[in-house]
Amino acid sequence: MNKKHGFPLTLTALAIATAFPAYAAQAGGATPDAAQTQSLKEITVRAAKVGRRSKEATGLGKIVKTSETLNKEQVLGIRDLTRYDPGVAVVEQGNGASGGYSIRGVDKNRVAVSVDGVAQIQAFTVQGSLSGYGGRGGSGAINEIEYENISTVEIDKGAGSSDHGSGALGGAVAFRTKEAADLISDGKSWGIQAKTAYGSKNRQFMKSLGAGFSKDGWEGLLIRTERQGRETRPHGDIADGVEYGIDRLDAFRQTYDIKRKTREPFFSVEGERESKPVAKLAGYGKYLNNQLNRWVKERIEQNQPLSAEEEAQVREAQARHENLSAQAYTGGGRILPDPMDYRSGSWLAKLGYRFGGRHYVGGVFEDTKQRYDIRDMTEKQYYGTDEAEKFRDKSGVYDGDDFRDGLYFVPNIEEWKGDKNLVRGIGLKYSRTKFIDEHHRRRRMGLLYRYENEAYSDNWADKAVLSFDKQGVATDNNTLKLNCAVYPAVDKSCRASADKPYSYDSSDRFHYREQHNVLNASFEKSLKNKWTKHHLTLGFGYDASKAISRPEQLSHNAARISESTGFDENNQDKYLLGKPEVVEGSVCGYIETLRSRKCVPRKINGSNIHISLNDRFSIGKYFDFSLGGRYDRKNFTTSEELVRSGRYVDRSWNSGILFKPNRHFSVSYRASSGFRTPSFQELFGIDIYHDYPKGWQRPALKSEKAANREIGLQWKGDFGFLEISSFRNRYTDMIAVADHKTKLPNQAGQLTEIDIRDYYNAQNMSLQGVNILGKIDWNGVYGKLPEGLYTTLAYNRIKPKSVSNRPGLSLRSYALDAVQPSRYVLGFGYDQPEGKWGANIMLTYSKGKNPDELAYLAGDQKRYSTKRASSSWSTADVSAYLNLKKRLTLRAAIYNIGNYRYVTWESLRQTAESTANRHGGDSNYGRYAAPGRNFSLALEMKF
């Protein structure tokens, strides 16, 4: 393990403990004086728990998880958070990172993600890399959340912009960070929590240490978490016995003329004393089949055997055959995923002061870094025999002793990518490698004022919160193309240099940053009379945002110029070989002439004002209601050409009714709406490779809209609870990439019809589904069964109803590939009543992906967003925990205990056209297989 990323938990724990010696001493020897009694009253303050019906009367579509739930489910990353929640999936981006969540048939920026009420970075995709090495130069990832900092997670399925604002079309995921009280045990004024965990599927090792205190009105916490891991390994059977045979090109010295039984003419280099044979391409099929092998056959037939030297040359002229393991093989048919090094580090600090019994003032600091360093192993490291034509016309002259320097190729650089002379040659002898580095950083600083009072008091508010947060999130995606380490070596740090003729390196980089300055205020008041109870919430907010995108592209090539100077005294060709010079270049120099694709920072400034009002009320004992609305006004401004700007005014609402005829049964109905203003990616628009007339502007975009309707039945009692709901969702004005025929003047001023590829409000779609959620307490069903024995069940099914495209557009994007196949999750478990130990088994069954949901029309042609759809699969997981003396908890789990081989749709979806970092040339889908039997271990300590 790299030591600079680690920290000793024991020493750090001691350091934090000694920082609060007085608090520890008081907890150990409490005295019954008045001051101590008052102190104990202060530290019992707890944040209000978030429930499924905290904001809305019905609770339909809501999932709430606490930090204890996350620990019990052994959540080590975003893919573990919703493992047992059908209908919620993670969007894989093909580069180790993720693009957010998929809920109710939509994903990415259509599912809002926030931390403490502050929106996280949008998924931003680069439309093609500048250097032209494929579509994986972009990112499309969002920053991930550090789960050791999280107190509660609220997952809201269905349109919910009245609560979460723009982006909550299919749903929202809202995180709340921990408070000092989350780290302090009851009756104490300080607390320390340490956790160490390991997951075998991606060899991730996590360690976290946190400390909190509360004394004399002051309270605070500090949490440090570090993670280190690798790529997720597929099922072990995938690579068992797999071996690849390759035939690669190389070079040989043509010393003999096999046909004439003579020595080939040599050449000489000015400044060198001895002449040398020319370097020729080994493995060139046309030469071997049409000439060399035929000449050898003729010599044998004529009883003119080859000399030992000639036989050696014939062998050297053949392709180099190698047998490679699944781990070593590179190319489109690779069966294993790309190797990845993952690291993250996070700090969370809070400090505040309570005064007057009802007031709290505090601050927060959060800093999280994540890095995903990948080698793209689908990039073929060698040059295969099918690439021989690239090298066949080279003279084969070289200086020194390394004859392989005489063979190189000049890449076919398209005109729009700039000066062709920037890349004059790439050598055959170098390994062809590609690395993708994805680095994220999120930093937040905030101030908070909170006023808390008893419910139904005569004061002006039961609770009031005023907060200001300053957040910056940056993603840095860099694609390195290297031809500078001699095959078979791989060296990520190598670069083109003058001592390596025809070496080459290229960096295709994209920076994206979002800044938010967010001011929020909320006021809560409870009222009641003889017949009704009301809980009113009034909210205001202002968000000043900025998005900055900046591409970079830079290459270096160490090429040489060889010039024939005639003949030497032996009548042999003589060459003057110039010393290699490193030529630095960038396609940005040419792209500067295209207004749509400049390699300079492009900025969009945004502002959003919102006001919301929500009332959760009851009439008598049979009816509960919720009714709320929100008004948003967004402005986007920019000085950039060909970047959209404008004002968007959106209104959203929610309503719910819960009828409870008795204490065991209830009927609920929920209706809500959602909206999404165009994302920064859509405002910037598609990067295009040709210019437009002065004054041309991109077509305006409208906000996307969503409508959600749900009806549910719920039974609850000593036996547990069961909820069955049916929902319908409709999405309108969905923004998609499409071609639209437009007439523009050409250079002669004549109108010419061309296809303009950009973002348009192109689609409407609707879907419906069923959701089941339940838990059975078997002791409540039959008293003789052990207390703590339970069964959980969850089911979700979504069925698309309609998809309609706007006339005149030829779509270039997916339709419904974000819809998760139907999934069943059934759990059986036992928790010892005193919490000393527990165990459970989770059974999951998923149907296959319906291929019809992958089809869309591009003009008159029917296309599919992926070549394959997943099949049905099932798996079983077992987990257990053991509490020792209330301070130590050991958790363990075995996943896919049957070692079943399967592929989830979420993983296979990485091959879809919507994936920013898609492996378009994959011919082997084994790399997307789920892990085989794997385990996780966690050790938690609380003091």
UniProtKB/Swiss-Prot annotation:
GO terms for cellular component: cell outer membrane. It comes from Neisseria meningitidis serogroup B (strain ATCC BAA-335 / MC58). A motif (TonB C-terminal box) lies at residues 926-943. Belongs to the TonB-dependent receptor family. Unknown. May be an iron-siderophore receptor. The keyword Iron applies. The lineage of its organism: Bacteria, Pseudomonadati, Pseudomonadota, Betaproteobacteria, Neisseriales. This is Lactoferrin-binding protein A. Residues 1-27 form the signal peptide. It is found in: Cell outer membrane. GO terms for biological process: siderophore transmembrane transport. Its main location: membrane. It comes from the Bacteria. One of its GO terms (molecular function) is ferric iron transmembrane transporter activity. Transmembrane segments: none annotated. Residues 189-943 form the TBDR beta-barrel domain.
